[in-house]
Amino acid sequence: MRGDDDWIKALARRAVDAGYKSITLTVDSSFYGNRERLSPTQLALRNVPERDFQKGITWDTVKLVQDTIGEVPFIVKGIMTAEDAAIAVEHKVDCVYISNHGGRQLDHVYGNIDTLPEIVEAVDGRCQIIIDGGFTRAGDMLKAIALGADAVAIGRLQAWALGAGNAEGLIKCLELLEIEIERTMGLLGVTSLDQLNPSYVGPAMPVRLPHEHSAFPHLPDDRIA
């Protein structure tokens, strides 16, 4: 947080006044992890303060934002445990967003898909659940839906598509993804997402040792240096 409570409220009001359909509070990045892959770039952000006004985000912060935005749907992003999901529901958030910040915050943390079932159980239908985590293929997205997620976020995939082909690239990416989803659902024998359930997903041993680019099987030499 780069300001005090008044700064938080002013920023939230600006978002509401600008017509945003929902407000998201990211709760897992009050401290940044060791991002060693970025060190060689010598990237520096000008006009951005190097220190934050307040590092601690508490459930009082959640209530502060909720009281400020009123009826606008409120999402808490960065939930990774059933315990935090249950507390979020008690605070009447509209959506729990499962995310480990791309796995860049803390080594050896659980993968998002690993925590999904216990969070679904803790939420028990009382709010919506979004999950992210480098999803790029329809099969993996449908696994998350089958395990109880209401939506799968694909920000990184869309950013790659925009970088590759601007708006046309993004449209093409979404069209290909739609085709892949339809084909996968057809092969599963379902006609709507609400027909999916955990029985469609089972454990499997990895076919190779995992690494930071395991999800991208078509990379030259198996990874980007």
Label every model-predicted segment.
Residues 2-131, 138-160:
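Alpha/beta enzyme core
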Residues 113-225:
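Alpha/beta catalytic cores of nucleotide-metabolism and tRNA/nucleoside-modifying enzymes
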